[in-house]
């Protein structure tokens, strides 16, 4: 399968005119034979891309004390203190901006109830509720894992998109990223491959090329 995917990637990139910005490479996933009005049938999962998506995910961490220091040392893009959390709960505009700026959130478990109450509607709508960080858990390991993860969410729509890399990445690396996504979908969907109507690969502004 990898060779076929790689050929599709090469075709999608070669047929896309050069742009004045770094285009992402995206998958368009089309599902069928599955009732997405039932929440239990919807896709809401994560997959680690073996070669990342061309840039590390931006990670924000709700933490205090020693955990906050460890998160900063581990490369967290932003560490949110309890005081800042309180202010975000009082300013929805800033909360929405934060939700859009960062790809993933981590939170010490002690802050989860407050986050759910004050920021839940904003983060939840975007599929960005924080990953809980239990006491004594390794925040550095969690940050490292999230750097190359993509979230796969169908919601209630049969067609959805996933960024799997950048146009300037090697075609084989992109193919391996795509293969990881397809494998994860097959494992997640109720009837596996039978629920995949089609998968297309394309650059941000380029034509779509069928993968399966």
Swiss-Prot record:
GO biological process: regulation of translation; translation
Keywords: Repressor, Ribonucleoprotein, Ribosomal protein, RNA-binding, rRNA-binding, Translation regulation, tRNA-binding
PROSITE patterns: RIBOSOMAL_L1
Family to which this protein belongs: Belongs to the universal ribosomal protein uL1 family.
Role description: Binds directly to 23S rRNA. Probably involved in E site tRNA release. Protein L1 is also a translational repressor protein, it controls the translation of its operon by binding to its mRNA.
Subunit details: Part of the 50S ribosomal subunit.
Record-given protein name: Large ribosomal subunit protein uL1
UniProt source species: Methanothrix thermoacetophila (strain DSM 6194 / JCM 14653 / NBRC 101360 / PT)
């Amino acid at each position: 399968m990898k060779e076929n995917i790689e050929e599709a990637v090469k075709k999608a990139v070669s047929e896309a005119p050069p742009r004045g910005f770094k285009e992402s490479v995206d998958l368009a996933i089309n599902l069928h034979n599955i009732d997405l009005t039932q929440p239990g049938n919807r896709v809401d999962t994560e997959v680690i891309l073996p070669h990342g998506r061309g840039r590390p995910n931006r990670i924000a961490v709700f933490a205090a004390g020693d955990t906050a220091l460890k998160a900063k040392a581990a490369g967290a893009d932003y560490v949110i203190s309890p005081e800042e959390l309180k202010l975000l709960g009082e300013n929805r505009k800033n909360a929405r901006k934060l939700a859009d700026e960062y790809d993933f959130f981590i939170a010490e478990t002690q802050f989860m109830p407050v986050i759910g109450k004050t920021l839940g509607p904003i983060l939840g709508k975007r599929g960005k509720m924080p990953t809980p960080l239990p006491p004594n858990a390794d925040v550095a390991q969690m940050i490292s894992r999230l750097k190359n993860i993509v979230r796969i969410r169908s919601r209630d729509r049969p067609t959805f998109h996933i960024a799997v890399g950048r146009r300037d990445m090697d075609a084989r690396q992109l193919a391996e990223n795509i293969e990881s996504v397809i494998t994860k979908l097959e494992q997640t969907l109720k009837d596996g491959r039978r629920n995949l109507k089609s998968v297309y690969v394309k650059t941000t502004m380029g034509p779509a090329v069928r993968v399966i």
